[in-house]
Design a protein with these regions (language model features):
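Class I SAM-dependent methyltransferase Rossmann-like catalytic core
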Residues: 2-27
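Conserved alpha-helix/loop element of class I SAM-dependent methyltransferases that forms part
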Residues: 18-37, 52
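Class I SAM-dependent methyltransferase SAM/SAH-binding core
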Residues: 40, 45-94
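A short acidic, Gly/Pro-enriched loop at the edge of an enzyme's catalytic core
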Residues: 92-104
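A short SAM/SAH-binding and catalytic strip from SAM-dependent methyltransferases
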Residues: 102-117
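A short glycine-rich, Lys/Arg-flanked "PGG" loop and its adjoining helix->strand segment in the class I
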Residues: 119-131
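Conserved class I S-adenosyl-L-methionine
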Residues: 134-162
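Conserved Class I S-adenosyl-L-methionine
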Residues: 174-245
């Protein structure tokens, strides 16, 4: 498979002020060659990105793994994605043979791996990747209006820094090489606070423990970002594309 080669670019946890506004699918297609690939997605959540990849790229097969057992049970009810196999395991213990995938993708999930298991997770990714295989790591950047709302009940600054440091260690270890680091913003449009609450507070993969008083603060901050067109946020992201050496 023809893949992009390494560019000499330093790693940064946050990007420049001016960034393109685009979708993750556009970035994926620009950075990866999916044709005929066997793909592993770690932390597939409700399988939104899983569906996009399965339906809009040329992959041959895909394993979509999720550690949240409640969400995994829901994913198993999906019947219209014949290329996809849903599985229940984490990045630190990938249930797959050695050198069995061309591409591994993590959408906003690396920072959810426990800090003590991050290095083990990269060792597992190295194990199951084919020689020359790629790891696409998309992480949210800890800044912006959307982040200002979320941090009130889910402050991820420390774990995101830990995930970023783990990427650096994986490169320094010689297992992986950095191909490219890219920054972009994606647009999140929400109709109401109720939609925000349902999608980000009332989740099954984490216990938010949001008190009534805190919920009022979250709502107030969310409402403060209302625009004429509604609740529209440009969310900053960082993608690190690695290749197995």
């Amino acid at each position: 498979m023809n893949m992009p080669q390494r560019k000499d670019c330093g790693m940064q946890i946050a990007g420049p002020v001016d960034q393109p506004v685009t979708s993750e699918l556009v970035v994926l297609r620009e950075m990866l060659n999916f044709e005929g690939a066997r793909l592993l997605e770690l932390g597939c959540g409700a399988a939104e990105k899983t569906r996009l990849i399965a339906e809009r790229t040329g992959i041959s097969a895909m394993v979509a793994a999720e550690v949240d057992r409640i969400q995994h049970a829901k994913n198993l009810e999906i019947r219209d994605l014949p290329k996809v196999t849903f599985a229940a395991f984490g990045a630190e213990s990938i249930e797959a043979p050695d050198e069995s995938f061309d591409i591994i993708i993590l959408f906003k999930s690396l920072h959810h791996v426990p800090a003590a298991l991050l290095d083990q997770s990269f060792a597992e990714m190295f194990r199951v990747l084919k020689p020359g295989g790629h790891v696409y790591i998309s992480e949210p950047v800890f800044e912006g209006e959307f982040n200002e709302v979320i941090r009130l009940f889910n402050d991820e600054e420390v774990v995101r820094k830990g995930a970023f440091a783990a990427i650096g260690r994986a490169i320094e270890s010689g297992q992986f090489q950095l191909v490219e680091e890219r920054f972009f913003r994606n647009v999140v449009k929400l109709a109401s606070f109720a939609q925000f609450e349902q999608g980000l507070i009332n989740v099954t993969h984490s216990e938010r423990n949001v008190s009534p008083a805190l919920l009022v603060r979250i709502r107030e901050r969310f409402e403060s970002f209302r625009k004429p067109e509604g609740f529209v946020f440009e969310v900053p992201n960082r993608v690190d594309l690695l290749v197995k050496r």
